[in-house]
Amino acid sequence: MRTPSDKLDIMHTALNDINNEVTRAVKLHGPLNSLHEAYSVILEEFDEFWEQVKVNPKKLDLDGQVKRSANMEVELIQIAAMCVRTLMDVEI
């Protein structure tokens, strides 16, 4: 079970990773131009996360489970980063 300190460490790491991903995505792709574009980008990232969720970890070896967990973390960071980009780029 995660302690409050563990959760705080995870939050700090995630926020740093989100910041890095926002910076990388803006440099690579430029700003989002509309809510429709933002929705499609967020949905694409969410679908990539969902693909990992649907994998039965009991059918994976240890290496596969580790890769799945890492992939889910990456996708969650990307989802959060695209939400931040939407707040930055699109007038709501």
Regions found by a protein language model. Give the residues of each.
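Flexible "arm" and connector segments at domain edges
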Residues: M1-I92
